[in-house]
């Protein structure tokens, strides 16, 4: 009787990094993926036709990888795009991994065994299910870092032990950079280009709603996944992002729940600008 290869049974991860003129930040991201001791990794770099040294960093990365003891697949595409979420949708379409994680330039996987930790959590959940179904989502925690890569501490919002689509009524409790989506589901639910700043919030909810409808597991890896740069698109456009998130919450949770939750947010954070 032929036995399956245990290595082949492990999930393959696509780490997708969207870049544009990111030479000052991308090396930190590259090195964190390069350091992973897990072999089934595709690092997909979708570049928006950068004019700085971003691609030079990628080419050096590819050269180092060709000589590495643990080689990962590195794929780079550089062409003009229509913005961040258009590039992220390209990454979804190009991904060959079973799970996809978006890691922006300047963000980093927390430790060399991060992907191994997530893979073990996925396999444990799969083998404990009756039909050995692959989880819809795996998630974990994040730590904030500054531009120098120094850890500032955890995010204000923390991931729950058990995550469902309803959890996001309380805000984006799981950072996008710590949310591994089953790639098949990601292709069913591309980022909605109507949202300029918060399409990731909507995307995560839609994938988790699918998981609930089809009884697919959502797995807590119970580890820190990423060091998250505390200066992203949402941070730079905070007010516009909040308005989009309000619309997204109304879409998924209805007016009553959304208004009630925003009243709670205002009472908890009276000095926080909305």
PLM regions and their residue ranges:
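A conserved acidic beta->alpha catalytic loop
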Residues: 39, 47-56
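Short beta-strand-to-loop element that shapes/binds the nucleotide-sugar donor at the catalytic cleft/hinge
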Residues: 138-150
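Short aromatic/hydrophobic "clamp" motif used to bind/position activated sugar donors
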Residues: 100
């Amino acid at each position: 009787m032929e036995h399956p290869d245990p290595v082949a049974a492990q999930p393959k991860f696509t780490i997708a990094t969207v870049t544009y003129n990111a030479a000052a930040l991308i090396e930190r991201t590259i090195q964190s993926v390069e350091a992973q001791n897990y072999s089934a990794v595709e690092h997909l770099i979708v570049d928006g036709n950068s004019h700085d040294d971003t691609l030079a960093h990628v080419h050096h990365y590819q050269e180092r990888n060709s000589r590495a003891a643990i080689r990962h697949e590195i794929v780079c595409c550089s062409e003009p795009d229509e913005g961040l979420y258009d590039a992220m949708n390209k990454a979804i379409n190009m991904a060959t991994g079973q799970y996809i994680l978006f890691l922006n330039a300047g963000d980093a996987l927390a430790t060399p065994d991060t992907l191994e930790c997530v893979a073990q959590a996925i396999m444990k959940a799969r083998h404990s299910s009756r039909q050995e179904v692959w989880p819809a989502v795996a998630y974990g925690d994040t730590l904030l870092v500054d531009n120098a890569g120094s850890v500032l501490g955890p995010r204000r919002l923390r991931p729950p032990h058990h995550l469902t689509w309803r959890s996001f009524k309380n805000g984006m409790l799981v950072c996008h950079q710590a949310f591994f989506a089953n790639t098949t589901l990601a292709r069913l639910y591309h980022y909605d280009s109507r949202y300029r700043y918060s399409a990731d919030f909507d995307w995560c909810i839609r994938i988790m709603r699918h998981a609930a409808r089809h009884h697919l597991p959502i797995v807590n890896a119970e580890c820190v996944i990423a060091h998250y740069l505390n200066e992203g698109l949402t941070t730079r456009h905070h007010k516009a992002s909040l308005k989009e998130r309000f619309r997204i919450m109304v879409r998924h949770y209805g007016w009553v729940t959304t208004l009630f939750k925003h009243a709670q947010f205002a009472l908890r954070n009276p000095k926080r600008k909305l």
